[in-house]
Amino acid sequence: MTTLTRQDLNFGQVVADILCEFLEVAVHLILYVREVYPIGIFQKRKKYNVPVQMSCHPELNRYIQDTLHCVKPLIEKNDVEKVVVVILDKEHHPVERFVFEIAQPPLLSISSDSLLSHVEQLLRAFILKISVCDAVLDNNPPGCTFTLLVHTREAATRNMEKIQVIKDFPWILADEQDVHMQEPRLIPLKTMTSDILKMQLYVEERAQKST
């Protein structure tokens, strides 16, 4: 078994690649399942050996890709605590927050290629859970939109400023109303633990969604 520290960036990049690829699929699937956009803009694809729905809308896809492209260097440095998909009503108040809590161990234990295969199996379980999450959530009001939030560790601020200059992608401090909901209903969806990554997904759902 090989043990690497967080400073071994080559493997840190592998972890970031795996996670960002997963998050891209997960965001698309959340938008489809929660009917944020018309189903006509989605096409069925196969990811992690299961069917998923991916958007064909260029601007939407670019927003998701650009966000994750800028998040990737922060994940490499273990500076990301949460990635959140916030679904907003017409008044731009959050009705649902899909929260991906991310933790990486300071030492990465790599035993074999089977580890990555195991991680893929764990991520597949997340995708399957997202695909049926509407069974435990109330319907959202019509006309919803969404935004992506990234919760970082305090030390990440300088890195974000550098990335903003390099990538020409503006980071904006989130509005307080996007970050918090009053007394939301908490719905745990899935948790995974592996030698390279720990992650849990839960939904914060507003008690009254009707507008």
Swiss-Prot record:
Question: Please, which domain of life does this record's source organism belong to?
Answer: Eukaryota
Compartmental location: Nucleus; Cytoplasm, Cytoskeleton, Spindle; Cytoplasm
Query: What's in the keyword line of the UniProt record?
Result: Cell cycle, Cell division, Cytoplasm, Cytoskeleton, DNA damage, Mitosis, Nucleus, Transcription, Transcription regulation
Q: Which residues belong to any copy of the HORMA domain?
A: 13-203
Q: Does the UniProt entry include the keyword Thylakoid?
A: no
* Record keyword DNA repair present: no
The GO cellular component terms are:
cytoplasm; nucleus; spindle; zeta DNA polymerase complex
- Xref: InterPro entries: HORMA_dom, HORMA_dom_sf, Mad2-like
An example GO BP is: regulation of cell growth
Q: How does it assemble?
A: Homooligomer. Interacts with rev1. Interacts with rev3l. Interacts with fzr1 (in complex with the anaphase promoting complex APC). May interact with cdc20.
**What does this gene product do?**
Adapter protein able to interact with different proteins and involved in different biological processes. Mediates the interaction between the error-prone DNA polymerase zeta catalytic subunit rev3l and the inserter polymerase rev1, thereby mediating the second polymerase switching in translesion DNA synthesis. Translesion DNA synthesis releases the replication blockade of replicative polymerases, stalled in presence of DNA lesions. May also play a role in signal transduction in response to DNA damage.
Q: What is this protein called?
A: Mitotic spindle assembly checkpoint protein MAD2B
Q: Which organism is it from?
A: Xenopus tropicalis (Western clawed frog)
Q: Which gene encodes it?
A: mad2l2
